[in-house]
């Protein structure tokens, strides 16, 4: 089971270079399992034991299976994650022609570790909006091949490179795509038009706009002398999206279960499809009775907010509280913060720990050092919007927000097992 899950994750990561592609990959797997797509613009007709999903902006997705029991009776079991990861996104007018090279101007999305982006074989993917036969359409594209690179400056020309060199995102991050001769002009939108034709057989009249991100073409892999680790891009937080999906598809329950994977977590979640937007609440209100019964159902429900945790790094152990250093391959981490950067409380943490113990899954705790700031997740945002009880958890990870992150190869199976038990649980606290 562990090897199959890990390979499934690797395949999912490869299919998901952007939030758009991740949402499409999740939808494809849901439909293969019998889930029916619902359109937010249409009237919904749902049935007990039905399986459905809905997307917004092509980058956020909510999947749910309705239980045999009324949600008012037993509440809803929700798992939340996010589809986006820090990256380099192409600017609207990106063409740069300098010293005989064609480059694209980029904007840093989220809190990316920038140094690892140098000297990597990069490709480009995302969503393109275009006009065809007088109509405006959108389509996902993925060049797949390594078409760009950001070469480092040789140390001979930058003797401070190993001494805390600050990276200027405006001047040092534009990737190189090609060389050009003389006064030749390169039209990026014409390149996108050609890609639409090659990849989808679409003859676009004009490319109107796009949302495109560079990504590392190196595939994720199980690595280490004993295969102890998984290295790959976008583990934060596609790892949790995939774990939630597998738990939803394999759990057997009479209760209503929901998986929500929001976009824009890395930039604050404040969007129509982010956790700080109305998507989840609007979806639940279409499934549940209004007024008093809606509030009662939410108060009987529980959300597991799943987002990667910081594993204790052997070279930087002092960055962790000495008593709260999560280890790779030692199970999921319950994340706690007294200032509500995480939404965990004693009741929700206790219930998650109870689930882990019942499934013989190891479990750990994390709290940030008292002299350091703490990150956050969709947990507190969703809890404040819905009023739903929440526990923040995640799998220990190294190099979070790097172009290539690292997690334990045993931990995915741990997380899928406990999330499956959560979905199947008959009684919530």
UniProtKB/Swiss-Prot annotation:
Cellular component, GO annotation: cytoplasm
GO-annotated molecular function: aminopeptidase activity; metallopeptidase activity; zinc ion binding
Keyword Protease: yes
Known EC number: 3.4.11.-
Single biological process term from Gene Ontology: proteolysis
CDD domains per record: M18_DAP
Record has Lipoprotein as a keyword: no
Binding-site positions, Zn(2+): 82, 156, 401
CC cofactor: Zn(2+)
Sorted UniProt keywords: Aminopeptidase, Hydrolase, Metal-binding, Metalloprotease, Protease, Zinc
SUPFAM superfamilies tied to this protein: Aminopeptidase/glucanase lid domain (SSF101821), Zn-dependent exopeptidases (SSF53187)
Family classification: Belongs to the peptidase M18 family.
Protein name listed in UniProt: Probable M18 family aminopeptidase 2
Source organism of the structure: Pseudomonas fluorescens (strain SBW25)
Lineage: Bacteria, Pseudomonadati, Pseudomonadota, Gammaproteobacteria, Pseudomonadales
